């Protein structure tokens, strides 16, 4: 039986944690526009969750492993932005930054899978 790629698993877990945090945030907002914004970002993260699920058993590499540090840093910034979610621009920028690092790691993992 093959083992799961621990780097991809770490990215997957980070995405799930952020999706959970956004799901909690949307349940407490009273601003309809903010709810739409949060929902859009939840969709973006959910898409990456599906992509990482499809890569869980793919090959690892030093470059992929190194990418997790950038993702962790961006994830911490996103967690802070979620706590201050009323600042919509900072929140969206933080999600964008986080997903940029995630996308780079996913793209690298896909090239290793070929």
Question: Each PLM stretch: what is its role?
Answer:
Residues 2-86:
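Short amphipathic alpha-helical segments that predominantly mediate membrane engagement
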Residues 74-114:
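Short, cationic, amphipathic peptide segments
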